[in-house]
From Swiss-Prot:
It catalyses: (S)-2,3,4,5-tetrahydrodipicolinate + acetyl-CoA + H2O = L-2-acetamido-6-oxoheptanedioate + CoA. One of its GO terms (biological process) is diaminopimelate biosynthetic process. Disulfide bonds: none annotated. Its EC number is 2.3.1.89. This is 2,3,4,5-tetrahydropyridine-2,6-dicarboxylate N-acetyltransferase. It comes from Pseudothermotoga lettingae (strain ATCC BAA-301 / DSM 14385 / NBRC 107922 / TMO). Catalyzes the transfer of an acetyl group from acetyl-CoA to tetrahydrodipicolinate. The lineage of its organism: Bacteria, Thermotogati, Thermotogota, Thermotogae, Thermotogales. Belongs to the transferase hexapeptide repeat family. DapH subfamily.
């Protein structure tokens, strides 16, 4: 899977988009006589739920305040430039609490765990697991059959803009709380130890550790056994 978005194109989308403040409002009152055009309403004559942008809701409430007895408003974002992804389009396992922006690609059989954050333009390969609270920055490219450990950070390249995204090739294991900095390429089959800070490219089938990350050894049979991907965790019912 390739990343077709440049930093400049994402910056242009963010700067030119209409900023939105999506809200949910729970309303009580004499609702049967109210014109609901401009908002999305679900309910009865005296109680309902409204989905709208905050400015549209504000105008709606001002216009119909004499018919509404009570209202509770919950805002999902404020002046948001890009929407969240429609996760139903992914043939992957996405756990509750994962935060995935629009314009993200996620391959078949991938696993996105609770609290993981995937920013705009990122690419996640088939059967790759993004573990709890990991952060995948804008335009980062993660290959197939990888494991990005809990709390790890794969740097984004939107601000400051960079032409070269982070690339994690296939079958890479990134340990918990490791950090891979902007523009770095981690070669196929490599292992990045927990807590490492990777500031330069990593050769394929290499183990690196430390701050900054340095060569420890080539991947051997013992390393492969300790870092193997568990296929059953990537299975889906359909």
């Amino acid at each position: 899977m390739n990343n077709d978005l440049t930093a400049d194109s994402i910056i242009e989308m963010i700067s030119s988009s209409k900023k939105k403040t999506p809200v949910i409002a729970y309303v009580k009152g004499h609702l049967s006589d109210i014109d609901m055009s401009g908002v999305q309403f679900f309910g009865t004559d005296n109680f309902g739920i409204i989905f709208a942008d905050y400015e549209d809701l504000r105008q709606f409430l001002e216009k119909n305040g004499n018919k509404i007895h009570d209202v509770h408003i919950e805002a999902k974002a404020r002046n948001s430039a890009l929407p969240m992804a429609d996760i139903t389009k992914f043939n992957a396992r996405v756990e509750p609490g994962a935060v995935i922006r629009d314009l993200v690609k996620i391959g078949d059989g991938a696993v996105i765990m609770m609290g993981a954050i995937i920013n705009v333009g990122a690419v996640i390969g088939e059967k790759t697991m993004i573990d709890m609270n990991a952060v995948i920055g804008g335009r980062a490219i993660i290959g197939r059959n990888c494991h990005i450990g809990a709390g790890a950070v794969i740097a984004g390249v939107i601000e400051p803009p960079s032409a070269t995204p982070v690339v994690i090739e296939d079958n890479v294991m990134v340990g918990a709380n490791a950090v891979v900095l902007e523009g770095v390429k981690v070669g196929k089959g490599s292992v990045v130890a927990a807590g490492a800070v990777v500031v330069s490219d990593v050769d394929p089938y290499t183990v690196v550790a430390g701050i900054p990350a340095k060569f420890i050894k080539k991947v051997d049979e013992k390393t492969i056994e300790k870092t193997k991907i568990i296929e059953i965790l990537r299975q889906r019912d359909h």
